[in-house]
């Protein structure tokens, strides 16, 4: 009596034992395609990202908020986005964060540094006019300016060159009374301007960090 041969192939000609291997190969190919696509997108985004000038570490911040800045170029390629950490204020490629708890100057700088920033430098009247919109007139805010050696040589903490012609002191300031070698931005005499104060004086502060620019 003749015996039937066991069926060795499925309809269509594929051996049953090959099916798991084929599925595994297809799955690996799909993963490879997804990985390559992810790498291309990451590379594209990274190549578009241009950091602003100065020392900063936006990687300290999990989320960014981007604001489109005006550009003289009308084309889409000429548009620029300035990105800052959430809750920071954006102005001309920089980011600002006022904090109202009181610390000494050194403590304030350490706090800003922990966020990848420095105490605020002020280079123009426009920059000062921008930040005062977000300040409390009842408070004083440390800036990143001090006379570290008490010799009348003012320096910005982030090494920004100090321009003695671009200063915004209150009248009769700085007076260097009682070793006042640090600077606060304070509202007095109906305007915001600078006063020198002792560095162990406790005040609020403004942190500043260069933003990330996307073209």
Swiss-Prot record:
What keywords appear on the UniProt entry? Adaptive immunity, Calcium, Cell membrane, Disulfide bond, Glycoprotein, Immunity, Innate immunity, Lectin, Membrane, Metal-binding, Signal-anchor, Transmembrane, Transmembrane helix
Q: Taxonomically, which superkingdom? A: Eukaryota
| Glycan attachment sites | 45, 102, 111
Upregulation details from the record are:
By autocrine inflammatory stimuli.
Which Cys-Cys disulphide bridges does the record give? 84-95, 112-207, 182-199
Give the molecular function GO annotations.
Answer: carbohydrate binding; D-mannose binding; immunoglobulin receptor binding; metal ion binding; pattern recognition receptor activity
Q: Where, in residue ranges, is this chain on the Cytoplasmic side?
A: 1-17
- Residue ranges that the UniProt entry lists as topological domain Extracellular: 39-215
- Where are the annotated coiled coils located? none
GO annotation terms (biological process):
adaptive immune response; antifungal innate immune response; defense response to bacterium; Fc-gamma receptor signaling pathway; positive regulation of canonical NF-kappaB signal transduction; positive regulation of myeloid dendritic cell activation; T cell differentiation involved in immune response
**Localization terms from the record:** Cell membrane
One Pfam family per UniProt:
Lectin_C
Specify which residues bind Ca(2+) according to the UniProt entry for this protein: 173, 175, 195-196
Q: What Gene Ontology cellular component terms go with this record?
A: external side of plasma membrane; ficolin-1-rich granule membrane; plasma membrane; specific granule membrane; tertiary granule membrane
Q: Which PROSITE patterns match?
A: C_TYPE_LECTIN_2 (PS50041)
Does the keyword section mention Cell membrane?
A: yes
Q: Does the keyword DNA-binding apply?
A: no
Tissue occurrence: Expressed weakly in peripheral blood leukocytes, bone marrow and spleen. Expression is confined mostly in monocytes and macrophage and seems to be up-regulated by IL-6, IL-10, TNF-alpha and IFN-gamma.
Its membrane topology, per UniProt? Single-pass type II membrane protein
Q: Which residues form the C-type lectin domain?
A: 91-208
Give the quaternary structure: Heterodimer with CLEC4E; disulfide-linked. CLEC4E acts as a bridge for interaction between CLEC4D and FCER1G to form a functional complex. Heterodimer with CLEC6A; this heterodimer forms a pattern recognition receptor (PRR) against fungal infection.
**What job does this protein perform?**
Calcium-dependent lectin that acts as a pattern recognition receptor (PRR) of the innate immune system: recognizes damage-associated molecular patterns (DAMPs) of pathogen-associated molecular patterns (PAMPs) of bacteria and fungi. The PAMPs include alpha-mannans on C.albicans hypheas and mycobacterial trehalose 6,6'-dimycolate (TDM). Interacts with signaling adapter Fc receptor gamma chain/FCER1G, likely via CLEC4E, to form a functional complex in myeloid cells.
Name the UniProt record assigns to this protein: C-type lectin domain family 4 member D
């Amino acid at each position: 009596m003749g015996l039937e041969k066991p069926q060795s192939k499925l309809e269509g000609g594929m051996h049953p034992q090959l099916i798991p291997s084929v599925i595994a190969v297809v799955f690996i190919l799909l993963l490879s395609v997804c990985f390559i696509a992810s790498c291309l997108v990451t590379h594209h985004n990274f190549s578009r990202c241009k950091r602003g000038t100065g020392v900063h570490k936006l990687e300290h911040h999990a989320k960014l908020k981007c604001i489109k800045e005006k550009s003289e170029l009308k084309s889409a390629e000429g548009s620029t986005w300035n990105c800052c950490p959430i809750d920071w204020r954006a102005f001309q490629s920089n980011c600002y964060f006022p904090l109202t708890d009181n610390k000494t100057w050194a403590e304030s700088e350490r706090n800003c540094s922990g966020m990848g920033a420095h105490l605020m430098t002020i280079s123009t009247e426009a920059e000062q006019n921008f930040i005062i919109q977000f300040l409390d007139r009842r408070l004083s805010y440390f800036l990143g300016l001090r006379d570290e050696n008490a010799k009348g040589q003012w320096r910005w903490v982030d090494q920004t060159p100090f321009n003695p012609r671009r200063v915004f002191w209150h009248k009769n300031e700085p007076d260097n009374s009682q070793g006042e070698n640090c600077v606060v931005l304070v509202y007095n005499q109906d305007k915001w301007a600078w006063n020198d104060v002792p560095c162990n004086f406790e005040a609020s502060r403004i942190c500043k960090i260069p933003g990330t620019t996307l073209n």
